[in-house]
């Protein structure tokens, strides 16, 4: 497999940009929860939101004039990934570039507004301005139009693992000689409705922080943002292997799939970027790591950045790539002291490979391995 990361873009609750966000993670910074409320109920929740000003330099494209938050996040991350790639590998022909967009919950804010009008005033009140933003592929459509991509553009809908499955699809696309590049973008927006749903599923906690790898899961905090990687045949970081994993219908099956993925991707020189988020995922990942790679250094970005669902796996890939590039990993925040895992120290890491484990909350598990 000759698949490399040529450029990356990052829009997070800690800011925008690969180096600025990475520097904050290395310093031990973490996002601050903001209160989310809604007129339909008195209950409030906490979520990690994108800071004001993070999107201030987006181009004044007509497509973004009325675009939803998720579309704007995706556009910012995608454009940043392209800009970084151009600075490292040179000019990029967008006519030979495909686009794969990964999403989980989609444009919830505009969808809620659209159906609220319908329920309140009848079908005749349905807004033709809001409807285009309610479909899952709206961000991909906007980004393709901004970049001038007239060919292959796909949207994958899944859970927290969908970003890795999007990279697998991009790898398949790049086997076609018609493409030299594939831009993979994952994005999510936070809303009260999502918080309420995850709360009802007993996956959400009322206040930060996210506490990973504790013996009794304590819940997660939702976040929003986007991550993007431009895949090409040139670049510093190489994707050695992608494991599309599998689906689980029962939580007790998660550990079995994670162990198989780790077994297939195992490398004694690899660190692990986990998807631990304060839910059942943590214990499943811990058990698999203890069995397959017990000495590996383990880091998870979600205590600092939150659970961004559709964007989360791309964020993990960016963290893994940065760890290989800088030879450092941030501190593992709020982790259980008796977790039985090896967490990063302030010293440089000697890892030359990085394994990304991504376990979603709705039945999907996947993984990949990077090297430099």
Language model regions located:
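Short beta->alpha junction loops
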Residues: 155-160
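Internal active-site segments that recognize and position negatively charged phosphoryl groups
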Residues: 169
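Conserved "HGTGT" condensation-loop signature of ketosynthase/thiolase-family condensing enzymes
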Residues: 1-152, 164, 172-176, 187, ...
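Alpha-to-beta junction loops
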Residues: 178-180
């Amino acid at each position: 497999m000759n698949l490399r990361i040529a450029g990356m873009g990052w829009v997070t609750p800690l800011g925008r940009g690969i180096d600025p966000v990475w520097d904050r993670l290395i310093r031990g910074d973490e996002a601050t929860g903001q209160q989310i409320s809604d007129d339909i109920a008195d209950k409030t929740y906490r979520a990690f939101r994108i800071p004001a000003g993070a999107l201030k330099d987006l181009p004044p494209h007509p497509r973004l004039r009325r675009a939803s938050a998720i579309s704007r996040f995706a556009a910012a991350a995608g454009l940043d990934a392209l800009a970084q790639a151009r600075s490292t590998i040179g000019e990029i022909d967008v006519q030979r570039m495909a686009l794969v967009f990964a999403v989980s919950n989609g444009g919830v804010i505009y969808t809620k507004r659209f159906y609220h009008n319908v329920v309140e005033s009848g079908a005749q009140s349905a807004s033709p301005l809001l409807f285009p933003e309610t479909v899952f592929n709206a961000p991909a459509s906007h980004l393709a139009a901004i970049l001038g991509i007239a060919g292959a553009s796909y949207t994958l809908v899944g859970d927290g693992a969908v970003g890795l499955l999007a990279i697998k699809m991009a790898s398949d696309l790049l086997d076609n000689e018609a493409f030299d590049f594939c831009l993979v973008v994952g994005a999510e927006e936070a809303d009260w409705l999502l918080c309420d749903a995850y709360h009802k599923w007993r996956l959400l906690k009322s206040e930060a922080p996210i506490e990973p790898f504790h013996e009794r899961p304590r819940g997660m905090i939702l976040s929003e943002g986007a991550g993007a990687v431009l895949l090409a045949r040139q670049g510093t970081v190489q994707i050695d292997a992608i494991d599309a994993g599998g689906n689980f219908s029962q939580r007790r099956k998660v550990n079995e799939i994670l162990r198989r993925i780790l077994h297939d991707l195992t490398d004694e020189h690899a660190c692990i970027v986990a998807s631990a988020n304060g839910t059942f995922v943590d214990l499943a990942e811990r058990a698999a790591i203890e069995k397959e790679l017990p000495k590996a250094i383990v880091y998870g970005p979600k205590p600092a950045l939150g659970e961004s669902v559709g964007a989360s796996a791309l964020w993990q890939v960016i963290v893994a790539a940065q760890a290989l590039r800088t030879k450092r990993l941030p501190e593992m925040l709020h982790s259980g002291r008796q977790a039985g895992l090896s967490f990063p120290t302030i010293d440089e890491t000697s890892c030359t490979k990085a394994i990304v484990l991504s376990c979603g909350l709705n039945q999907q598990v996947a993984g990949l391995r990077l090297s430099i």
